[in-house]
Regions:
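Short, charged, low-complexity patches
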Residues: 31, 141-154
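Gram-negative outer-membrane assembly/targeting C-terminal domains
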Residues: 157-184
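Short amphipathic alpha-helical signal-transduction/dimerization elements
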Residues: 39, 86, 150-161
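Charged/polar, solvent-exposed surface patches and flexible loops
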Residues: 76-80, 84, 151, 155, ...
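Beta-lactam-recognizing serine transpeptidase/beta-lactamase-like catalytic domain environment
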Residues: 1-141, 175-184
Length: 184
């Protein structure tokens, strides 16, 4: 950041960066791992593709818990806020009956249409999944990222979609997303 701002950080720079604007760069995998860290109240496991290799030991780098320097009690506050976002905030479309989903929307500004972003995890107190969804050029995080993330979490956690969710999934499959165009 010092290179980008030539050492001239100010209050506006800090505010802008704190909401993810400016030079904040993170991949969807990094955002999902952040969600996993919040879900686990302060630890994550290094993302990896291979779960096991027959008759082989996986390097402990990929199986051990890596703890942050932030106390678990602080993550609880963040998780509660993310739960409230699903109950009564911008993540309401992430509600899945019988599952306590926690989430956070995002809208990544772009030269064209904004990108719809969602980060979430579930269940709140015994997390099984953390997810990040980016849908380019479609607008607010609540428009696409949240409902698509909820569908993916429901499928993963329940092994299937409810009839209502199946209809929603079909509707999103039929929508035209105008990548790279000024029209929606």
């Amino acid at each position: 950041y010092d290179k980008a701002y030539r050492g001239s950080w100010n209050g506006l720079t800090v505010i802008s960066i704190s909401i993810g604007q400016g030079e904040v760069n993170a991949t969807p995998l990094q955002i999902a791992n952040l969600g996993a860290t919040i879900a686990n109240r302060g630890y994550f496991i290094t993302p990896h593709v291979v779960k096991q290799i027959q008759d082989e030991q996986i390097d402990t780098l990929y199986t051990r818990r890596r703890y942050t320097m932030v106390e678990a009690r602080h993550y609880e506050t963040v998780a509660q806020g993310m739960r409230r976002a699903v109950l009564a905030g911008t993540c309401r479309k992430a509600n899945i009956p019988g599952i306590e989903v926690c989430g956070k929307t995002g809208t990544a500004q772009n030269r064209g249409h904004d990108h719809s972003v969602f980060m979430g995890f579930a269940p709140m107190n015994e997390p099984k999944i953390a997810i990040a969804v980016y849908v380019e050029n479609v607008g607010w995080g609540a428009d696409y990222g949240v409902p698509l993330g909820a569908l993916m979490m429901e499928q993963y956690l329940n092994g299937k979609l409810s009839p209502e969710s199946e209809k929603l999934a079909e509707m999103y499959q039929q929508r035209h997303i105008g990548y790279g165009t000024a029209d929606r």
